[in-house]
Amino acid sequence: MNRCKGRNSSFLKKERQKINFISQDMGCLVSKPADSGGNRRRPGNIGEVYVYVPGLRIPKPVDFSLTLGDHLSKNIVERLSALRTRIVVMAGQEGPTITRTRRKTATQHGGSTLADLQQALEDYLPVLLGLVKDGNQLQHKVQFAWINQEDDLEETAMSNAWYEVLSVLHLMAMLSLSQANLLLLPRTSADGYQPKLSEESRRASIDIFVKAAGYLDCAVRHVLPQLPAEFRRNLPVDLAEGVLRALCLQALGQGVDIQLGMAIDSTKATLAVKRRLACEMVKYWQQAQDNIMNLPLSNGWGEKHRLFVKWKYIEAKAAAYYYHGLILDEGNTEKSHGMAVAALQAADEYLKESKKACEAFNSATPLSRNPPLFGTMKYLSEKIPKDASSKVRINRDLYSFEKIVETAPTLPDFALALKPDEFQLPGVDPSWNEENINRGQVGSKQLKSDQR
């Protein structure tokens, strides 16, 4: 196999026994096996989880001066270096602990840490995009390396700036989901009794979910297509199209979950509104599951991600069948009452299954636990068993879970209303315009000198 060319060849030679790489015409891809040790730090316990974040990919240092020093001005090289180094340091320090959702951390430090790192990424992105503007050939000069979380390979490096853009958007989305998780952990009320979640926090979380979905949607529609097919095939599973789509749908599904909880608390929301939200939630989670079903999510973070989606999909079906059953029960025919009973029984069974799925998720490494119930599931965990038992007159012990689900009426199909934020890649930083002007002046002077 051919070796990647460039100034880092001596390093690659030293590392050849533990690094596999694939030569590309436009750059090189480097993947370090999971057992090579060292960089990937995983917590044994991530505490309370309402929004699952499958770890944070951490960037490794890059020396821009080595690869770009002969091609760009000192100003641009130093800006790229300073902005990315800031991210490397912050992500390296906070990444392994940022998913630790201790309530103290969430209220005193977590928010500012997330916001600072998010701002650092937003500052870096416009400058980074100068490397890919108008097919800039410099996009293949720098090898960008990131530590993976869901992939079996510990790290992946590619000599393509679009890979760096993709990694930045993914990290921005994961930080947003982390922020939503911290926001949705109920705080102990002033009277010291039942933990509560404010209306303001719930509304803010929906905005964050939509924003996270926007980053991921942009990554899938506008960044992935920029990578050559060979690069896309060799992306870590963290950045696979299926995982990106699943995370986008997960964010929207959890946003609708919050909307449903708010509808439950509202005296103005009708049963029809609640059923529609619950049925939409089922579709989001079903599509999320379809996207990751056949992906190699086998290690800790990846397997836990799969279990989270499975749990939330089952939980959503419990909610949808419950509200569908209540509406069917409003009918005046014997058939509608029979269908209502079947729907409520299915809701009860799905609720039981969701509790098993929840236990499987929390017991998978890294370990986690549920925050105090609130919103949708707090209400439904009390109402479903009660309403199902009052409506169901048959001996449910005679029926298996599979039989009950088979006889349940079909859920209505609604168009999905909650959409990702229309995030667009920012314009290239103005410093690149100055760079082009300066380069043009240098080229003009050189041409006149040659003509003499």
Task: Label each residue range with its predicted role.
Residues L138-L175, C218-Q226:
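Extended ligand-binding groove/face enriched in aromatic
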